[in-house]
Amino acid sequence: MKCKTLLIACLFGLGSAQALAVSKLPPQIPVHAGSGRVTLDLRPLLAETNDVEITRVSVCRRVGSHCQETLWRIELPPGWRAGEIEVFGDYPGSSVLLRRPERLQPDGSYNAFIHFNERSRRHRQTVSSIAVEFCLAGEPGNWMLLDEATCLARRNAEERQGEKP
């Protein structure tokens, strides 16, 4: 009887530990476009993560579901926690590894990758990056963002076009 009680207690404890180990998804990162600038709003990421620092951001031109060309890559200084980052911006203490602003075009599909360090309460690394998909329309210098459904339709059309011989 004691053995069964101990077994049940262990299983209950194991189930509780597994429930605590569930990771949560990173928040959505809003993208803003206008006046020839594209910015990523990092405030939701900073607000919903523990002791986070943004380490690297990159943007690539996407064709279908694959990155075809990297347009911008920046390494940010330790402890960087700004609430917003402008694509192709230059920030004090950062290293811009690649910058091709002329390749950011209307009617393009893009992914922004935000790499960060977040420490849990036990000082273990948890989630380390988030990808943000966005599509531009309009005229150069007067960009507009497409809604998610239109961007998804564009990605699917590009994917199908790439499959044809």
From Swiss-Prot:
Any single Gene Ontology cellular-component annotation: periplasmic space
Name of protein: Type VI lipase immunity protein Tli3
Consequence of gene disruption: Growth of mutants lacking this gene is affected in the presence of various P.aeruginosa attacker strains because mutants cannot resist Tle3 toxicity.
Keywords: Periplasm, Signal
Keyword Zinc: no
Signal peptide coordinates: 1-21
UniProt function note: Immunity protein that neutralizes the toxicity of the P.aeruginosa antibacterial toxin Tle3 in the periplasm to protect the cell from fratricide intoxication.
Localization (cell): Periplasm
Keyword Signal on entry: yes
Quaternary state and interactors: Interacts with the Tle3 toxin.
